[in-house]
């Protein structure tokens, strides 16, 4: 069983190799807008899970996730060969590709935080003109007890 530091180093190296191979070696137009975001390795260093995101050709255009997944699936053998050549280990890990959902999750979390900030601002505006209920000084003191001390 390999240590976690070696697995992390190998995952980082695989991320770099796959990203540069997609950019330079793989001639598939469907992979133009694919970004490799992360790679995780199993403890035995036999499997690597490659996470990727896809952006659209423009800001308004939606990304074509299915086409990118199909292109990565078709290029998996070539990518594994390139990783094996550049990695220099006895066993080349099996590469599986998974869409990275972190950007969507972070956008959702940002929307929730924005909604909470707006609600806090509304409450602060309501609080500005508010007066406490009841007496101004709820702790009444008798004049006798003050003079006795």
From Swiss-Prot:
GO terms for molecular function: ribosomal small subunit binding. SUPFAM superfamilies: Ribosome-binding factor A, RbfA. Transmembrane segments: none annotated. Coiled coil: none annotated. The gene is rbfA. It holds the Pfam family RBFA. Disulfide bonds: none annotated. Residues 124-149 are annotated as: Disordered. GO terms for biological process: maturation of SSU-rRNA. It is found in: Cytoplasm. GO terms for cellular component: cytosol. Keywords: Cytoplasm, Ribosome biogenesis. PROSITE patterns: RBFA. HAMAP family: RbfA. This is Ribosome-binding factor A. Belongs to the RbfA family.
């Amino acid at each position: 069983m390999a240590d976690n530091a070696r697995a992390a180093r190998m995952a980082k190296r695989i991320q770099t190799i796959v990203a540069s191979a997609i950019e330079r070696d793989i001639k598939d137009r469907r992979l133009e807008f694919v970004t490799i975001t992360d790679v995780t390795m199993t403890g035995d260093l036999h499997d690597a899970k490659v996470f990727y995101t896809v952006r659209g050709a423009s800001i308004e255009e939606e990304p074509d996730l299915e086409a990118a997944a199909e292109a990565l699936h078709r290029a998996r053998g070539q990518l594994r060969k390139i990783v094996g050549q550049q990695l220099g280990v006895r066993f080349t890990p099996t590469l599986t590709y998974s869409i990275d959902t972190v950007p969507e999750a972070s956008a959702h979390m940002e929307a929730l935080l924005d909604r909470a900030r707006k609600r806090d601002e509304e409450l602060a505006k309501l609080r500005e003109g508010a007066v406490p209920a009841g007496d101004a000084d709820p702790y009444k003191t008798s004049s006798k007890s003050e003079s006795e001390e």
